[in-house]
């Protein structure tokens, strides 16, 4: 038995899909445990680029299972479209498994998501308007519709009628929008459910059986620790728990079955949407990194905010997720910069602090304390080992390890799988 959790250590978009795809070569099961189609991941496979929102990267290997766990909120329409997208590109998705306990996103969730965000005016949190938050709200309120409910025609009809009666009161009276009609939703979404039915099962049983039989399971998180609803920059967060602890709840697997946790990070920092970002760059260096790395959201297409590497963020992420290894991406993006800054701590009203504050007011007052390191000009995109890196690039990686307190197991010098280089071969234990 062996299991590894892949967790984003910043604000998402760290390249989790790339390292998950890399690690999945040695996995038997690849499982996603939270989030929805609000976060995309980009995977390059056999020379083709795939942009997926819901389906785990294990889908590309027919000798592996790709699992969508119970902690995911599932838009049936999006998933059916994603399955067709894969088929159109020559990928057979028959190795997909979907939890019968996963909650379903319906049109009223999307309508409410947009209306609620619009009503917040200056207090917007940067939602993707995919209905994720309202779906998780229904789950917590115990009125959500699960995949198991979607598959039963009578059950789905009864629950949809009940929920629409309540949601339309909010949609029409609070937000002054047109009500949604039962007949505009029921037939289409029941049909989506029937299309997905062959993939639906109790995924907790699937995963635990695999582990009990000595197979390797890779758990794939969406977003990142700093977007975690409990540990992130609340309220500028997602509605679920991307931290490693989310695996046990979102997959139906006990904590004793989790072996290692890989924190994925960029060689710098990026963020989409509003919220605190102490090391954010507003100059030509930020523009250079954004354009060099094509830093635009996979789903939203929004330009990402760019900043220097922040070790305060990484230490926080390490602490709350228990990283055993780091996987660093985009090292090549920094090539050409004369000087590279690394945030070692914050100055909070004259006091040096090393831990990430919970208070937004304190975060606004925090000023990053930087250490400057010399950059490099050499092309590193063809590098295959740590030793082949320029000395300054080696020193940069060692500095990050020192500041975070976790060793880097892999580093990437480009988007292709072949550009992922391994330092520590014992991620699987």
Swiss-Prot record:
It is found in: Cytoplasm. Its main location: cytoplasm. Substrate binds at residues 298-304. Mg(2+) binds at residues 13, 40. The active site is at residues 13, 41. Transmembrane segments: none annotated. Keywords: Cytoplasm, GTP-binding, Ligase, Magnesium, Metal-binding, Nucleotide-binding, Purine biosynthesis. It is an enzyme of class 6 (ligase). One of its GO terms (molecular function) is magnesium ion binding. SUPFAM superfamilies: P-loop containing nucleoside triphosphate hydrolases (SSF52540). SMART domains: Adenylsucc_synt. IMP binds at residues 13-16, 38-41, 128, 142, 223, 238, 302. One of its GO terms (cellular component) is cytoplasm. The keyword Cell cycle does not apply. Binds 1 Mg(2+) ion per subunit. Homodimer. Plays an important role in the de novo pathway of purine nucleotide biosynthesis. Catalyzes the first committed step in the biosynthesis of AMP from IMP. This is Adenylosuccinate synthetase.
């Amino acid at each position: 038995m062996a299991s590894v959790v892949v967790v984003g250590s910043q604000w998402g978009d760290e390249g989790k899909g790339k390292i998950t795809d890399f690690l999945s070569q040695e996995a038997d099961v690849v499982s996603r445990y939270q989030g929805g189609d609000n976060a995309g991941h980009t995977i390059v496979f056999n020379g083709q680029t795939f942009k997926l929102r819901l389906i785990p990267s294990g889908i590309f290997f027919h000798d592996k299972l790709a699992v969508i766990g119970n902690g995911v909120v599932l838009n049936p329409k999006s998933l059916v479209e994603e399955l067709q997208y894969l088929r159109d590109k020559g990928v057979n998705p028959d190795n997909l498994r979907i939890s019968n306990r996963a909650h379903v996103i319906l049109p009223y969730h999307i309508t409410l998501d947009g209306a609620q965000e619009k009503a917040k005016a200056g207090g917007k949190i940067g939602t993707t308007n995919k209905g994720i938050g309202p779906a998780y709200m229904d789950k917590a309120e115990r009125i959500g519709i699960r995949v198991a409910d979607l598959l039963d025609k009578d059950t789905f009809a009864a629950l949809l009628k009940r929920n629409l009666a309540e949601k339309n009161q909010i949609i029409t009276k609070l937000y002054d929008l047109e009500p949604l009609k039962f007949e505009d939703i029921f037939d289409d979404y029941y049909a989506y459910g029937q299309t997905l039915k062959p993939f639906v099962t109790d995924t907790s049983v699937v995963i635990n059986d695999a582990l009990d039989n000595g197979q390797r399971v890779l758990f794939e998180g969406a977003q990142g620790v700093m977007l975690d609803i409990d540990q992130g920059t609340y309220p500028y967060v997602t509605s679920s728990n991307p931290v490693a602890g989310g695996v046990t709840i979102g997959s139906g697997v006990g904590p004793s079955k989790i072996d290692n946790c890989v924190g994925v990070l960029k060689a710098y920092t990026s963020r989409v949407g509003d919220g605190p970002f102490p090391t954010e760059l507003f100059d030509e260096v930020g523009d250079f990194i954004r354009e060099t790395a094509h830093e635009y959201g996979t789903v939203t297409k929004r330009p990402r905010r760019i900043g220097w590497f922040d070790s305060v963020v990484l230490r926080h992420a390490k602490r709350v997720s228990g990283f055993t290894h780091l996987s660093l991406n985009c090292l090549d993006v920094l090539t050409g910069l004369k000087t590279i800054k690394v945030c070692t701590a914050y100055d909070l009203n004259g006091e040096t602090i090393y831990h990430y504050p919970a208070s937004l007011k304190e975060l606004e007052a925090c000023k990053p304390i930087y250490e400057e390191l010399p950059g490099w000009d050499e092309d590193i995109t063809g590098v295959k080992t740590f030793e082949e890196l320029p000395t300054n690039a080696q020193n940069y990686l060692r500095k990050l390890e020192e500041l975070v307190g976790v060793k880097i197991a892999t580093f990437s010098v480009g988007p292709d799988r072949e550009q992922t280089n391994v330092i520590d071969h014992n991620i699987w234990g």
